[in-house]
Amino acid sequence: MRTNYCGLISEQYLDQTVTVKGWVHRRRDHGGVIFIDLRDREGIVQVVIDPDTPEAFAAADSSRNEYVLSITGRVRNRPEGTTNDKMISGKIEILAKEIEVLNAAATPPFQIDDENISENVRLTNRVIDLRRPVMQRNLRLRYQVAMGVRRYLDAQGFIDIETPMLTRSTPEGARDYLVPSRVHPGEFFALPQSPQLFKQLLMVAGFDRYYQITKCFRDEDLRADRQPEFTQIDLETSFLNEDEIMDITEGMAKQVFKDALNVDLGDFPRMPYSEAMFYYGSDKPDMRINLKFTELTDLMKTEEFKVFRGAADMKGGRVVALRVPNGAEFSRKEIDEYTKFVGIYGAKGLAYIKVNDVSNLSNGEDSGLQSPIVKYLSENALKEIIARTGAQNGDIIFFGADKAKVVNEAIGALRIKVGLEHGKDNGYFTDEWKPLWVVDFPMFEYDEEADRYVAVHHPFTAPKEGHEDLMVSDPANCLARAYDMVLNGWEIGGGSIRIHRADVQEKVFAALKISPEEQQEKFGFLLDNLKFGAPPHGGLAFGLDRLVTLMTGAESIRDVIAFPKTQRAQCLLTNAPNSVDDKQLRELSLRLRQKATETKEV
């Protein structure tokens, strides 16, 4: 019987006999004495086996990395000069008396302590990958966060209620994952993109405070922070306004960080969406980086430089500057790389000015400003740019000029990239936790491709008081009672006050060009139940995967999920998705128009 975990044996167990079980992390033979580092989920302990115990010595001699052993022995101090203060077990070792080989192991595809393994190799051999201490720590922290959330919400009076995994398809936003019904040929269930409508109906039913930690599914193009199936901390409340909901969920975030990381997040400032976009070009600004946009659109309307003038005069156009302290030292190669980088976001180029001498702001050859564009700008404009940005000698000013969407995305991404690469050495990056709330989102945004307005969050978000009429008369300026929790440039949670009146919900659907017939077909069950005395209600959903990724410092959410999918939505461990035989398809009344092709990653 095991008496202790390997990584938890300390000096308090000196001279005691213990039994540990685990995997051979490393085996060393030193002059006839064998050393084994035995590993389990709590860490590693050093075991010494000498020839005086021949059976144990023989078992140790035949063991290799990843063999599973049971070891009984006496705890003793390590010799002077061989201790490791970074480990709980770093000052002791076990002198083995008995060793039992519980299972042999084939040679693993990589060493457990190898840090230079490709992600595809790791995901193909995920079980072995999960033995690595970093993965064990990540998933343990994930568990601690989930348990902390449950404890906090339970103390706040929330009830854990499960909602269906098989529901109806409502194709708004991302694509649904569909499940064919055998019992109802030709009809399909959808896996939920969120429990949104069910949790609202639970409020109508009178449960007052609901939560669950649940799987959600979206068939969308994947990025580093996306998965086709992801875990959501979902909650909903009745009779609370947005300030009260934000206070509860902010308290939850603070408690979780304190318990799991011993970090005090402090109070969360609140920033209107318009301010976030104006100064940072993003609705999830990374406040660790002390760089802001400077607005130049008005200034460029009277300039002759076509690149800037054209953007300033364009409907929905924008011209901004981004001052980077000490950036004049950037090489031509670095600037070219930044130019290529902003091109990813649709920018056609990256204009810049290096500030060498603010006392000489002419546009002539002797100018204290170094740039190919200086000669195209008036001296008045150059002086105004320096004044507005506050640029000093040694700075560089980058410019964005295009449609506002392109400028915001391109220069916003450049702000992050420059800040992370150069900010710490130059005083404009603070390496600490910087949370905030972004509030007062627009209710709608115009989708040029679809030629209609679409909901910024979702169509069940309530408009701000006094903005109801704007949904029809001026949808572009209609604000929503929505709020996002942002941490270090990541949106970790988003929510809103919901629409609790059927007539208002119908108005929102109408503004989104959803006909009354389509409303009834897709959302009739919601509209019908809102008429039975629905209380005012609202809520929020956290992305558990994203939250834990931030807390662990992992490079991808795939590093905090036990069995994730790749960026092509495949499981390399099980080779899912896979083709199925014709018999299964016939049972589901399905026939393939196109046979499956081999697209597995290698």
From Swiss-Prot:
GO biological process, one term: aspartyl-tRNA aminoacylation
Catalytic reaction list: tRNA(Asx) + L-aspartate + ATP = L-aspartyl-tRNA(Asx) + AMP + diphosphate
UniProt entry keywords in alphabetical sequence: Aminoacyl-tRNA synthetase, ATP-binding, Cytoplasm, Ligase, Nucleotide-binding, Protein biosynthesis
GO MF annotation terms: aspartate-tRNA ligase activity; aspartate-tRNA(Asn) ligase activity; ATP binding; nucleic acid binding
Location of region: Aspartate: 196-199
Residue numbers marked as site, Important for tRNA non-discrimination: 30, 81
Protein name: Aspartate--tRNA(Asp/Asn) ligase
Record organism: Neisseria meningitidis serogroup B (strain ATCC BAA-335 / MC58)
Taxonomic placement: Bacteria, Pseudomonadati, Pseudomonadota, Betaproteobacteria, Neisseriales
